[in-house]
Structures are given as C-alpha cells and as structure tokens.
Amino acid sequence: IVGLETSFALGYTELVDKGVLTLSQLVEKMSVNPAKVLGIDKGNLAPGKAADIVIADITKEYKIDSSKFVSKGKNTPFDGKKGKGRVITTIVDGKIVYKY
C-alpha cells in the first residue's frame, strides 16, 4: 500500500507535533477506526486477542528515504522530508515481522 511506510511518521510530525491531534487520537485513527471500517476484530490490545503492535520512536527525527522502503512501492512525494516517529518494530500475531 503506497504511503503505508511513511503514514505514522507523517501523521505524528504533521498532526501530533503541531497540536492538531493527540497521540492517542492518531493511534485510534490508524488502528481502531480502520478495523471498524473493515469489520475485523483488530485495533486494540486485550487478553486473548492477537498481539498486532507497532513500536515507534517518536523522539528521533529521521529523513524519509524511499530507496530503503521494504515494500515494492518506492513512489512517494515525501522522499527526503524529515519526520518523527520511525517505526522500530512491528509485531503481528505476537511475532516480530519487522525490526529497524
């Protein structure tokens, strides 16, 4: 999905850092709300549910570099833009599937 690799960092930098949303609101808009729209039982942490978690470093600024994207989609208008909120680890069903 084009833009997925930059969506959290851009959302954090442009919305949370600038006071438009709280971090909790951003997380809800990127997890709970899409799960509701898709009708899937995901988007929250609870006993007995799949542990699908993204861990991001919201303190460190980094430069978006599309040549380092994991996905095949390398097209982005944000190549070279600085942002905060680099995803460090992604866990799906309790298993680490991505580690920076």
Question: Language model features by range: what are they?
Answer:
Residues I1-I58:
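His/Asp/Glu-enriched, well-ordered alpha-helical/loop segment
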Residues A50-K99:
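C-terminal cap of metal-dependent C-N hydrolases
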